[in-house]
Amino acid sequence: MYSASLVALLCLASAIQGLDLRSSEEQPCFDIPKPKSPILEMDWLFSVKPIYYPLMNTIDLYHASVDLLQKNARDVSTSSVYYDACLTWEMFSNGTIFSKGFNGLQREYISKAVEDNPDAFTMEPVDGEKDVYSGTAYTTLTDNKTFFVQAGCLPSGQMAWGVGTTTPTLPEETKKKIIEHVISLGFKKDDITELKYDTCKDIKV
């Protein structure tokens, strides 16, 4: 009984403790190969509303959540990120990007195309702290129908990646394909994490 209670307390403590951004770091930034020809159809991308965000590496999820909440990472619990984030995105042709989640919060970013790479763009918040979640994002894989994978370098000098989708969940075959792809880029399997939408209001899974 004692050991079971102790385990329960440890699990609870882990769930309510603040985020440790340093422990979520995967590896320093590295170069993303430029496609021989553009792979992302922008008209399709701008038509997807909302964009769900079910798969990414841990550091990306933590930074996106902290930036949306506008809080110190130590004041954001791990459990709130996985159960309350409900992250979605909207992207517009004028460069405006909105992240939404945590029961109605919204954060605005401005993006600019990278001249020599049509599958890349820079992004930073319109106001507030700019060194939490900004940088250059590169589209590395997409079917231009249901998902796209983007990777980039955070201001912390650490590499991040995430998957935008048209639905809250991904088919297993698609997920497998994406995981194989990000590993081939140099990311680590152990740092892959999933965001669940089961408990999100107004989102049908």
Residues covered by each model-derived region:
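A beta-rich soluble binding module of mature secreted/lumenal proteins
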Residues: 2-205
